[in-house]
A protein has these predicted regions:
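NTP/phosphate- and nucleic-acid-binding module
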Residues: 1-114, 118, 132, 147, ...
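Short, solvent-exposed helix-loop connector elements
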Residues: 108-113, 303-311
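Feature 926 captures the class I aminoacyl-tRNA synthetase adenylation module centered on the KMSKS loop
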Residues: 119, 123-200, 204-206, 247-289, ...
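Structured mid-domain segments that build the active-site/substrate or prosthetic-cofactor binding neighborhood
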Residues: 295-298
Length: 574
């Protein structure tokens, strides 16, 4: 059984056998008079009548329900049917190889999107471009009712030359009053009644917005960058390519960033009918625009995600740290009577300690990293290093220099505040692309406090990385030192020993020569942060005692009656 007029797969299967497609159903799914006693019945709804007829004729072998995929209306959820109609098409099947070759020049993020698009191109069919609607761009094709000649009109100017007089508004219904003379039989030609698929409009946007102006096209076409959801692989991305190849012989974009879909908390597609839509305004009203932007920016390219209020709260905490950091800079400046943005690096750099060298190295490493990521259009990877940078500024650098910035020598204070201000401002310039509202509010506060020159954070140029300030060894050493400090603070917490209480010594045990070198280099920082009078390094800690604590919940079920003996032995050995 095959129904070439009832679906694309059946139609393709019948083509080699020259079986013509047909489908007598009306637009509303009713059978016509030509079908005899079944006239007036409706497809799908009246299926039982056909089954009863087969049963009456004693030709029904079996009646049963079979589960299979079937198209349904996205709005009312009722089944829909395929129905063959006459349409206008773009002939694109012979463009496939050309499109595949041109696509190799396009930068896709992620790579999976590129592979999906290539697969789509390989299976590309001639594309239907006409629709039977009222709203839409009228199909600019005139047909002669006598000889059947067809003429495609390419512009308003051409139509006016053919028709003599045309209406100001070229949409329906006014356009249908325009007649032109057939070049073959001299009889009137009328416009075909269809409108153009809206995706054709979208596909021509890349040059329509330039008014087809040669100079603008040379300057702005093709587009450097476009971005849309992955479902646009077969829609906008496809039509952008098709119409561009047909008209200009080349692609209309150079780089594509593809993002995934946002589902509800339980992983379902959001739908008004299901009542599970999370409005962006709900999120904005609760936490602000920047939280929504930073939350969305962290999503891996091309991956679907389930919405999470907890992750939004995490972004709130991060942005709060950033906000508090700029307030701290203002307070430090007032307490020390130092204007950090008036300081020149040439004056203060000779007083840079390892903390300043580390923080400035981290800044320029991140500038270089983020600039490269932006150039490669890997937008989802930009936010993490920027957030790490301002969190390190707040939780690492400021903690390390807090005492020095208030009680140190004047030159030390200036070095601290210069570094603090420089790192904060450069970070804000970059993070502004993600969280522009908080960055602008911070900048206006800094501008008022320190009389900064630019009117807005957005008026600043993108930072440039200074390779001379990047010191990987210092960064790696400080990273390890911070891990040691974190481990020491954890040990204090386990021992329920507050940080205010000094300890005689902090013992760092490791067989790593790298750790030994870091402990030696960053000894003062480690001892200060751990409030330890002495830092001791040892490859082995002979005076340490290891205690083995049996996990009764695991031993009991696994060993049954042997559990008491095993527990006793473990306790004895430790």
């Amino acid at each position: 059984h095959s129904a070439p007029g009832g679906g694309p797969e059946d139609q393709e299967a019948c083509k080699p056998y020259k079986i013509p497609p047909f489908n007598p159903l009306s637009e509303n799914g009713f059978f016509p008079e030509s079908i005899g006693k079944f006239k007036g019945l409706r497809a799908k709804i009246d299926d039982p009548a056909f089954i009863d007829a087969l049963d009456y004729e004693k030709v029904l072998l079996k009646k049963m329900k079979v589960e299979h995929e079937y198209p349904h209306c996205w709005r009312c959820k009722n089944p829909v049917i395929f129905r063959i109609t006459y349409q206008w098409f773009f002939k694109v099947e012979d463009l496939r190889e050309k499109m595949l070759q041109e696509n190799k020049k396009v930068g896709w993020v992620p790579d999976t999107a590129k592979h999906a698009y290539e697969s789509w191109i390989k299976n590309l069919k001639d594309n239907s471009i006409s629709r039977q609607r009222y709203w839409g761009t009228p199909l600019p094709i005139w047909k002669c009712g006598d000889c059947g000649a067809v003429k495609v009109i390419g512009s308003r100017k051409e139509l006016k030359a053919e028709a003599g007089k045309i209406p100001e508004n070229l949409h329906l219904p006014w356009i249908d009053a325009v007649k032109i003379t057939c070049g073959k039989c001299k009889n009137p030609m009328s416009r075909v009644p269809d409108v153009i698929d809206v995706w054709v409009d979208a596909g021509t946007a890349s040059w329509n917005c330039l008014d087809n102006d040669p100079q603008k096209m040379k300057e702005w076409f093709p587009a450097d960058f476009i971005s849309e959801a992955k479902e646009q692989t077969r829609l906008w991305f496809s039509m952008l390519s098709i119409v561009s190849y047909l008209y200009l012989g080349k692609n209309s974009f150079k780089n594509v960033y593809v993002y995934g879909m946002l589902y509800d908390i339980g992983g379902q597609k959001m739908s008004k009918s299901l009542g599970n839509v999370i409005s962006p305004y709900e999120l904005i009203d609760k936490y602000g625009v920047d939280v929504m932007r930073s939350y969305m920016c962290q999503t891996n390219a091309g991956e679907d995600i389930n919405f999470s209020w907890e992750e939004c709260k995490s972004k709130v905490r991060g942005l709060t740290v950033l906000w508090n950091t700029h307030k701290l800079l203002i307070n430090l400046s007032r307490e020390t009577n130092i204007q950090p943005f008036s300081l020149k690096e040439a004056k203060v750099k000779k007083y840079f300690a390892v903390e300043e060298k580390y923080m400035l190295s981290r800044l320029h490493s991140v500038i270089r990293q983020v600039t490269e990521l932006m150039g490669q259009h890997r937008m989802d990877e930009v936010i993490a290093p920027l957030e790490e940078l301002f969190l390190e500024l707040s939780r690492a650098y400021i903690q390390m220099v807090r005492e020095k910035s208030l009680l140190g020598e004047e030159e030390e204070k200036e070095a601290c505040l210069y570094t603090f201000a420089a790192v904060l401002l450069e970070t804000m310039k970059m993070y502004n692309i993600i969280a522009p509202f908080i960055c602008e509010a911070m900048y206006q506060n800094l501008k008022e406090e320190f009389a900064l020159g630019e009117e807005s954070i957005s008026h600043h140029r993108w930072p440039k990385a200074d390779a001379k300030k990047i010191n990987p060894k210092v960064e790696q050493g400080m990273k390890l030192a911070l891990e040691i400090i974190q481990a020491g603070l954890h040990a204090r917490e386990k021992a329920k020993l507050g940080l205010r209480w000094p300890v005689k010594e902090a013992l760092i045990v490791s067989k790593s020569s790298d750790v030994k070198e870091v402990v030696s280099q960053f000894q003062n920082i480690i001892s200060t942060q751990l409030n330890a009078k002495e830092i001791v390094f040892a490859a082995e800690a002979k005076e340490m005692q290891y205690l083995v604590k049996p996990d009764y919940s695991k031993i009991g079920p696994a060993y049954g009656n042997l559990s008491p003996q095993i527990i006793a032995r473990l306790t004895m050995d430790s």
